[in-house]
Amino acid sequence: MTKVEYKHTHIAAKKKLGQNFLLDRNIPRKIVRESGIKEGDRVVEIGPGFGALTTAILEVMPSFTAIEKDRELAKFNREEHPQIELIEDDFLKVPLEPLAAGGKLSVLGNIPYSITSPILFRLLDNRHLIASATLMIQHEVAQRIAAVPGTKEYGILAVQMQAFCDVKYLFKVGRAVFKPRPDVDSAVIKMVPKAVDPVKDSEGFRTFVRRVFHQRRKTLLNNLKEYYDTSGVPEPTLKLRAESLSVPALITLFTQLKLIARGDASGQLLLKRRR
């Protein structure tokens, strides 16, 4: 267990919580700049830790909400940053509706690698409450979220996130600026939920995406025929692999399959491989 010293405090980084504390002061300021937050916004920080990002946010915001699960770090932040509203709890369990009562939330955070996916999908599920999310996550995951068709990184995570959010990969962060030093690099991404959901049946779409990418090397026909009536989909389309289709094209295919299921397959689906 690695003990991290900051000012008057020695706190052991807890491996089970995936704690890696950011030591560099310039990176948090860059994260805040990229987030675009301004005074008056409803800002929520996930896991302030020793307050590197907290301090940078306070240069812009006189007060905001931070959610910290670790009891020792929650106590530290109450003492070090009394102007913030500190919620000592797990972000995955905190109700977001009350926090967004005054406006949509701008979420920032240095996210533990071990719970990146649960946090991302919690934000996605609550996208109607979110103005933006600017997050530092594992570099490999950031690449997968921002991936484009035809690349090895492009898959379920990219499609599910990009279908409902505008996603931007901002910059890479080397592992040397953390203590304890992680085994991998990090990166900062920004996600902004789309003003209008392009898919009404979001749960059905998630299931569809998991199915089309279940076996990446198989064609759409082979991945879908067990679950959907594909009779109204042009044969050239069914010969494609999911990894070759853009997010809008996959949304169009899903919509067409739902029309076919309802017996309303008017018109033919026109899908083109991304060049």
UniProtKB/Swiss-Prot annotation:
The keyword Ligase does not apply. Belongs to the class I-like SAM-binding methyltransferase superfamily. rRNA adenine N(6)-methyltransferase family. RsmA subfamily. Its EC number is 2.1.1.182. This is Ribosomal RNA small subunit methyltransferase A. S-adenosyl-L-methionine binds at N20, L22, G47, E68, D90, N110. Keywords: Cytoplasm, Methyltransferase, RNA-binding, rRNA processing, S-adenosyl-L-methionine, Transferase. One of its GO terms (cellular component) is cytosol. Pfam families: RrnaAD. It is an enzyme of class 2 (transferase). It is found in: Cytoplasm. HAMAP family: 16SrRNA_methyltr_A (MF_00607). PROSITE patterns: RRNA_A_DIMETH (PS01131), SAM_RNA_A_N6_MT (PS51689). NCBIfam families: ksgA. SUPFAM superfamilies: S-adenosyl-L-methionine-dependent methyltransferases. Specifically dimethylates two adjacent adenosines (A1518 and A1519) in the loop of a conserved hairpin near the 3'-end of 16S rRNA in the 30S particle. May play a critical role in biogenesis of 30S subunits. CDD domains: AdoMet_MTases (cd02440). InterPro entries: KsgA/Erm, rRNA_Ade_diMease-like_C, rRNA_Ade_Mease_Trfase_CS, rRNA_Ade_methylase_Trfase_N, rRNA_adenine_dimethylase, SAM-dependent_MTases_sf. It catalyses: adenosine(1518)/adenosine(1519) in 16S rRNA + 4 S-adenosyl-L-methionine = N(6)-dimethyladenosine(1518)/N(6)-dimethyladenosine(1519) in 16S rRNA + 4 S-adenosyl-L-homocysteine + 4 H(+).
